Amino acid sequence: MSSAPKLFRVIGGAQNYDWGKLGSTSAVARFAKLNDPENVSIEEEKPYAELWMGTHPSVPTVSAQDRTPLRDLVRAAPEEMLGQDIIDKFGSKEGIPFLFKVLSIRKVLSIQAHPDKALARQLHASDPKHYPDDNHKPEMAVAITDFEAFCGFKPLAEIDALLQKIPEFRELVGDDVVAEFHSGIDSSDVAGKKKLLQKVFSRVMNSPESKFEPLAARLVERTKSDPQLFGETLADLIQRLDAQFPNDIGLFCGCLLLNHCILKSGEAMFLEAKDPHAYISGDIMECMAASDNVIRAGFTPKFKDVEVLVDCLTYSFNPVEEQKLKPAPFPRGTGVAELKLYDPPIDEFSVLQTTFTSAGAEKFEGLDGPSLLIVTEGKGKIKLQGSDEALDASTGNIFFVAPKAAIELVSESKDTFTSYRAFCEA
């Protein structure tokens, strides 16, 4: 007899980092309140940054019925909650291999990258205080409102144009490296071009405050006196981020070196290990491998590991459109809903968006691993196929779905009913 339920509601944990949206402007706060109204009261002056769903011990997700941590339920019945194939593949009976989050961003997050598995093992062994585990941390973001981020380095010709026309950028990098970069970027030697980009980034990141702070102040002034030099979008971006982090190195290493990526609701981007990125504003669903390893560079008062960062990045340089992850169809559901699968090229997770705009049902085959589903808009029902017991599924509600459990989502009106389901399969 199976003891663990195959479908049940859970409650995630909210994080109040300073960069979060304030009070009820935050999707995190609204979802947390709607899912647990008796225990959550929104403080309007307080930032609500992240809502965590998973088995990470830092911020427990608990059963809505009796507040038992999901991690404890998994550890008590790993074969039923994870599936033997997932246990074998990831080598753990302790938890779900991914962490699913809602993020509501008011202020820019630190420019950062995450190590791959080999580097994570090395960093964790040498500096466990700053690198708490030995796992990699690929991430995917799906916008649920208009969202902007830095992601990956700009194409080299764009960086070269900025170095040529913005005196403060040129002075920070140095005429010698600027000239070498300018003459080398048309080469067919990709590895050589990556080395040149690394030189530029290293000069920026290793410049002392006494050098970059006055240059940053001049840079901001130039965006006001000569905005057409930058273009309206970039000038505005530099001014907005300077207001949040005055004279920060991120104005150079973020605004002038990284792609400014703007996503509409439903658009996604995948961030591979060792790619620099930073979220700027908006609300997203984020899914990642279950790790806490971060190598930071700018827009942060926290520990910056410049040497590791400069050494580890891939230095890929691609147009901003190539940073986006296009959704694919999902053939394992039948019914009236629109299904979009966000399936990055890694093992730990995929995310399925299900949207109803009419009354009706969508039936899903059982998946070969655990999943977590959150309703982000509207309301409907969720149930196991063949069961008479349907659970209310409304905005903010989160559900755990066990491996092989075939579920059904039901919309009872023409109002939009949207959910996101993160899952992992062997």
Swiss-Prot record:
Gene3D superfamilies reported in the protein's UniProt record: Jelly Rolls (2.60.120.10), Phosphomannose Isomerase, domain 2 (1.10.441.10)
Against CDD domains, the record matches this protein to:
cupin_PMI_type_I_N
Provide the GO biological process annotations. Answer: carbohydrate metabolic process; cell wall mannoprotein biosynthetic process; GDP-mannose biosynthetic process; protein glycosylation
Active-site annotation: R296
- List locations, semicolon-separated: Cytoplasm
- GO CC field: cytosol
Q: How is the cofactor bound?
A: Binds 1 zinc ion per subunit.
Molecular functions (GO terms):
mannose-6-phosphate isomerase activity; zinc ion binding
Reactions performed catalytically = D-mannose 6-phosphate = D-fructose 6-phosphate
* Residues where Zn(2+) binds: Q112, H114, E139, H277
Q: What does the record give as its pathway?
A: Nucleotide-sugar biosynthesis; GDP-alpha-D-mannose biosynthesis; alpha-D-mannose 1-phosphate from D-fructose 6-phosphate: step 1/2
Predominant localisation class:
cytoplasm
Q: What is its EC number?
A: 5.3.1.8
Keywords (alphabetical) are: Cytoplasm, Isomerase, Metal-binding, Zinc
Q: Does the keyword Thylakoid apply?
A: no
Mind telling me which InterPro entries this protein's record contains?
Man6P_Isoase-1, Mannose-6-P_Isomerase, Pmannose_isomerase-type1_CS, PMI_typeI_C, PMI_typeI_cat, PMI_typeI_hel, RmlC-like_jellyroll, RmlC_Cupin_sf
> What top-tier enzyme class does this entry carry?
isomerase
**What family name appears in the similarity comment?**
Belongs to the mannose-6-phosphate isomerase type 1 family.
Instruction: Report the function annotation for this chain.
Output: Involved in the synthesis of the GDP-mannose and dolichol-phosphate-mannose required for a number of critical mannosyl transfer reactions.
The name this protein carries in UniProt is: Mannose-6-phosphate isomerase
